């Protein structure tokens, strides 16, 4: 393991402590969050979906839980059973659709609060789970520095929004710089 070379009051360490208090310790989890009024616009939602889908393509990533791939339980009255659908199918095309998604998420899907959204802070979050086998290897650092950070920066440049990122793999990589 790597020694923490940063002081306890360093912003990176403080952010990590806040992350642990809120989400607990998950050694392979990276959490990304947006906290801007522009989150629920078609442009930003679609770019957030693209970001999530891009991350899913990497072999270093086991799973990505984001607004676009949330399983939603729906009653099929004809078959008399429940089926699951994705929360967002395809592209968000209108502001009315974006507003509706926000309303459904915050009012009808409370079990996703804290994982995908935070109603109090108006944040939208994505959980990225790295392959546990690489968390303690150079492959983690290479992925974070050469793939993850550039993809996040591209999103930030395209939208003008700041992505808040935390989690053990991310913090350990930045701390080792």
Region spans (language model):
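Extracytoplasmic
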Residues: 17, 23, 46, 91-177
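Short amphipathic beta-strand/extended segments in non-transmembrane regions
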Residues: 32-35, 49-77
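Extracellular/periplasmic ligand-binding regions of membrane signal-transduction receptors
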Residues: 26-40, 85-86
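Transmembrane helices with small-residue packing motifs
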Residues: 1-11, 34
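Charged, often glycine-rich, active-site loop that binds/positions anionic groups
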Residues: 24, 49, 75-92, 176-177
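Short beta-strand/turn "edge" motifs
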Residues: 30-31, 66-86, 108-123, 127, ...
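Membrane-proximal juxtamembrane linkers immediately C-terminal to transmembrane helices
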Residues: 11, 15, 20-28
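Conserved, well-structured beta-alpha core segment at the onset of a catalytic domain
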Residues: 11, 24, 36-51
């Amino acid at each position: 393991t790597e020694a923490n070379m940063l002081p306890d009051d360093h912003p990176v360490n403080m952010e990590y402590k806040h992350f642990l208090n809120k989400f607990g310790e998950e050694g392979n989890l990276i959490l990304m969050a947006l906290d801007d009024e522009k989150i629920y616009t078609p442009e930003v939602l679609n770019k957030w979906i693209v970001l999530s889908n891009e991350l899913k393509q990497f072999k270093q990533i086991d799973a990505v839980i984001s607004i676009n791939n949330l399983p939603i339980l729906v009653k099929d009255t004809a078959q008399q059973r429940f089926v699951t659908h994705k929360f967002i199918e395809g592209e968000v095309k209108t502001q009315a659709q974006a507003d509706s998604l926000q309303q459904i998420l915050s009012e009808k899907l409370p079990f996703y609060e804290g994982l995908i959204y935070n109603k109090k802070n108006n944040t939208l979050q994505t959980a990225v789970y790295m392959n546990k086998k690489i968390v303690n290897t150079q492959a983690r650092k290479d992925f974070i520095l050469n793939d993850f950070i550039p993809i996040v920066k591209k999103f930030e440049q395209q939208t003008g929004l700041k992505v808040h990122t935390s989690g053990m793999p991310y913090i350990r990589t930045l701390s080792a710089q």
